Amino acid sequence: MRHPLSIPEVMLNGCYKGIPGHTPPFPLDKISDRNWNILKGDMTFPCAVLRSSALERNQMWMKRFLEQEDAVLCPHGKTTMSPELFSLQLKGGAWGLTAATIQQIQTYRAFDVQRILHANQLVGMAEIDYVCKELNENPSFDFYTLVDSPALVRILSDRAEINQTNLQVLIEVGQAGARTGVRSIDQAKAVCDAIAESPRIKLRGIETYEGIIQGPNDEEIETAIEALYSTLSQVAIMAESRGFFNQGPVILSGGGSAYYDMAARGVAAVPLQTERLHVIRSGCYLTHDAKWLDDYFQRMQIRTEVVGEPLNPPQEAIELWANIHSIPESGRCFATLGKRDASHDIHLPALKKWFRPGEHSQPTKLDGHKIVALNDQHAYIDMPANSPLAIGDMVAMGISHPCTTFDKWRFMPIVDDDYSVIAGISTWF
């Protein structure tokens, strides 16, 4: 997908976190003209920044991985909901974008995204009618959605007939006790039969998502993931043997957010005779993180050899900067950042660096300090007796789970390795 996106003009002012209050409104795409630098105190804190070198590194890492695994990437846009980052991903070779909700689909279309894989069920009348209208009015729009029941197939078929358009679907394979998706081959056959009865619904592939599988240890989780992809394989073989797939390559898709290798190899192992396309849907690869995804990556290195690694692993691209603003007692300080600024659903942010304006030329690694709690606007930090931190110092934090940090920022600056602001991104949650 090389189609240029339509990126809306965003005017920044002091209502955006990070922008000084008396700054006259200016377009986001002109932010480099401000000559701002994070370390010089040109922006207000807290401030979430994206490191340009890490974004580029992670993009190249994924490209090499996909080439090695003979797969394509349809990254989940819910991670960033940023047209600027969507454009970066599509220019980097992404096959399309994945969406989970109708709001995300509508937002992507506002940016003129031409291929969308809706990794969820499309069920509401208004939602189905919107997609049908987009397909009718835009012949280049390529759209896929998931089905896991004959009832849903009939709902889609009825609305598609009313709108006089066709809908491409993938059968979702799930797991007992987990989320959506057929649980058995018999359920999948019933869905296939319903699709075959509709002239408007076209079966294009099989899909699953392994990222929600839980277990007492890594080995049992990985065994369950292998079983899930075995079921996907059986469903695909059944659908091919009965002639259910429509014209075009059969799409075999896995999530891959934390299990890139298992998703890519799980779909590649399906023994079909038909031409096929292996699609993984990770959105978090672009920014990586400090703990959650990094732990998964370390585990992947144990499972498999990945091209270029470990010499050039992904890097965390998101940093949250704040000031130390209070040291009210021994062993405890506070930073100007909280739940409104950082993800906290999996792990709390981790202190990485500190910087003292007027004394340091570059940020320095900060060991022995730990964020132990967050309020809405405060970070509680345990500090050792020999801590160098003082009121007014700047601290940088790494995060876990990029999705729930991006949704707290309408704007993020992109910085070079000297923390000069060279660009920026907007988000549309």
Sequence positions of predicted segments:
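A charged N-terminal "starter" segment
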Residues: 1-133, 425-429
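A non-catalytic, amphipathic alpha-helix used as a structural packing/dimerization or gating element
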Residues: 53-61, 190, 227-234, 395
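Active-site loop ensemble at the mouth of alpha/beta enzyme cores that anchors a bound cofactor
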Residues: 223, 260-357
